[in-house]
Amino acid sequence: MHSEDIPEFMIRAGLTDENSISLSPAVSFRALLNVRMRQKQLTGTLPEWRLDNKPVAYSFIEQLGLRKPWTSSETYKLAELPEKENIVIKPADGAGSRGVYLVYGFNDIVDMKRSKNVGSWEQLKDSMEQDLETGWVQHDEWSVEELILENDNTPASDIKFYCFYGKVGLILEIVRVPERKYCWWTVTGERVRTGKYDEELFKGKGVTQDEIDLANDISLKIPAPFVRIDFLRSGDRLVFGEFTPKPGNYDEFDDATDQWMGDCFTEAQGRLTNDLLLGKQFEAYNQLMKTLNY
């Protein structure tokens, strides 16, 4: 039964009966995020979406005193791309791993989306040209940033925290070489299945409580019920990657996970509303928005 199909008398019973039935079927992460997207359509923007921009996100993270990769201050056409080692090449306006390349050396380059090695700089440019021709990358505008390594020859794994205003709900750990694998974690350190990537799971390394606390603290500084905070794991600490207000394929979680994350979202909305009513100012966020004239 979908949430909109639950009759009012059942909702009423859930609120009034001494042995009230659970109303958990009434919530859905998928549905709540859909509503959030409709809010964005109607209002033009939302607080978390203002951070869905690398320069803005990096400025926010710098305000908080956290580490981020070095990033070029300009974008490049493919023909103008500087030949450098130990860099990441990304589409300037892209998301996900399409068009992303890890350049360890001029003859040691990894195509992140295809999970394969590109043999030379010339082959790299051919592959990028193909990305443009097929529409994988929309515009011939590329950015360059520091290559973060987990150790001397292993690219950083991705650590993605699904944050619900001050509380991490789920954690996704991803390794991308030699092939892409995924591991879902709860905040209590249990590996779980969520319905996403069930055929591509591995036993990850997990995260520390300090790392969970870091994600919790950042999300408390953003006036939004949900945002995913993505990091790269370097040798000694997490390095900020990006804010993701709308995770890809968020409709693929199984029903149990979708319902549970719906509860997380709904509780977060309540906590955020209470904090706003109590006058919370979100100083770092508002200061940045004022600086940027948003």
Per-segment meaning from a language model:
Residues 2-8, 12-16, 24-31, 206, ...:
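C-terminal active-site "lid" helix and adjoining low-complexity regulatory extension at the edge
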Residues 58, 79-81, 95-100, 109-113, ...:
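Short catalytic/ligand-binding loop motif for oxyanion handling, primarily in non-cytosolic enzymes
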Residues 115-197, 238:
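Phosphate-binding site of ATP-dependent enzymes
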Residues 2-3, 42, 68-75, 84, ...:
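Catalytic phosphate/metal-binding cores of nucleic-acid and nucleotide-processing enzymes, i.e., regions
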Residues 32-102, 117-131:
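A conserved helix-loop-beta module that forms one wall/lid of the active-site cleft
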Residues 155, 160-176, 207, 211, ...:
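Catalytic cores of PAPS-dependent sulfotransferases
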Residues 101-106, 164:
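Short beta-strand-to-turn element immediately C-terminal to the catalytic PLP-Schiff-base lysine
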Residues 135-141, 184-238:
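A long amphipathic alpha-helix within ATP-dependent nucleotide-binding catalytic cores
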